[in-house]
Amino acid sequence: ISIDVREPSERLQDILDLARFTDMKLEEDFSFWFDPAEEIDESTRRALDQNREEIIPTEPVPGVPGAYWCEMNRNFVRFLTDNDETKLFDALARLAARGEANVGEGSRYVGSFRACGLVVPVFELSEGASASDVAPGTQALARALAEALTVTERLNDKERRARQGLVSRAVTIR
């Protein structure tokens, strides 16, 4: 199938069943793209093996749907949500203005990325922090974020400045 990624297409959240948003599965490699009934040739098998070695180790954060601990040069939590981008940044700005845009002690918001129409806030963790270590703080962030998403008042000056800082650290992945 030939696909030109520059052509307009549906957004990911338009084709996913958002009622099943929390029903995600982490895969060990990219073999899920292939039909299990078909034989994979040797060069494809080698490529899959090589890619398996390069996949960023990722674990779900216990008790927080959409939050994933990732091990890179440092450890991070990526928090995947299906919230509207404007509302999400407003809510994060409210938390940031209060010093609450983190997933626990020693963590900090480092930015976010947009992919397939979704915004994914990213938090850097203190050295050696595991997924279970950050679960309580990530659960607290999820509750605070849910509450902040219900606020409809305009942002105050401090929150607007915080929002500008948050948005300036957002990148789009295509």
Predicted feature locations:
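Long, charge-dense low-complexity segments
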Residues: 1-118, 147, 151, 156-159, ...
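A short, solvent-exposed beta-edge/loop patch
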Residues: 111-152
